[in-house]
Amino acid sequence: MKVERIEALPLTKEQTLGYARIAVREKLGKPAGNVRYMGGGSFGRAVSVQCTDGQSLVVKFLRAKDMMEKEAHDLKLLAKYSTVRVPDVLFTRRGDEKIPVDCYGMERIEGKSSLFALGMLLIGKKRRKEFADQVTTALHAIHSC
């Protein structure tokens, strides 16, 4: 088995905020109003953007080369085959001299994590089972693509 080592490109939280403004202006043709760092992991960073016209989106920056095609493809597959709502990809942008990493913008879907929601603990056993069935069905649909 061939194992490749993926090297993450350097990208600070502060840089992502400025880069999000640039990407939104270039790709959507409008100014970003409020930008807020959401979080990140080994290979990505996410920024919440509220445009001055009210549109909300998330810009995800990919710190590993050639990840954008896979991520965009996976989101499209999920949108097609999954029973859960998946954000639409609004734009993709290759890294260049202005923004050195690939990024894409996607629709922002409001919601909370059900994993730690107090309400999930308080609902009845039947409703918790129904929720678990929905999650299982969605996971099965995703892995059957």
What are these regions (language model features)?
Residues 1-32:
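Juxta-kinase regulatory segment immediately upstream of eukaryotic protein kinase catalytic domains
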